[in-house]
Amino acid sequence: MTTYVALLRGINVGTKQRVPMRTLRDLLSGLGCGSVRTHLNSGNAVFTHPGSDPDALAAGLEEAIARELGLSVRCFVREGVNLRRVVDANPFADRAIDPARFLVVFLSGAARPDAFADLDPGAYAPDEFAVGEREVYLICPDGIRDSKLAKLMTGRRLGEDGTARNWNTVTRLAAMADETTEADG
């Protein structure tokens, strides 16, 4: 069994796109997933599955949500070891950063550093970013809401669909994935 992490984009914000976490756990169980746990109310789940294709799991979860809830929700699934790699590869690890203002944008495909080649980092200071394998790390010390750089990360510049999680959530999900892998042993 492989440990996976599912990240659902744009749910439970306001009154639209409501996906109760109990329902998410039930949908994942219905897809053959085991050891299903959710974190927060924002579409984060850790689970095991015998399959080896995270993209197929994401597609299956999207279909289940559409069928059962009538919602179109983009889902991103990563192997637990890949989420641990995201944490371990933190390009800002040597700095004290407010984890609530430090985001990881998880992409549907490979990150494209060339998509950012024309950006003048000084124009977005004090915000900073670094491009990973299938993610972009983003620091917004003055907050995310008014960050011009954060707005770019949700636009077409990325070339891929994405969903963001703050560092607190990323590290907690990585820890949950580690625990699940150890327990499933």
Task: For every predicted segment, state its role.
Residues 2-185:
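Surface-exposed, charge/polar-rich loops and edge strands
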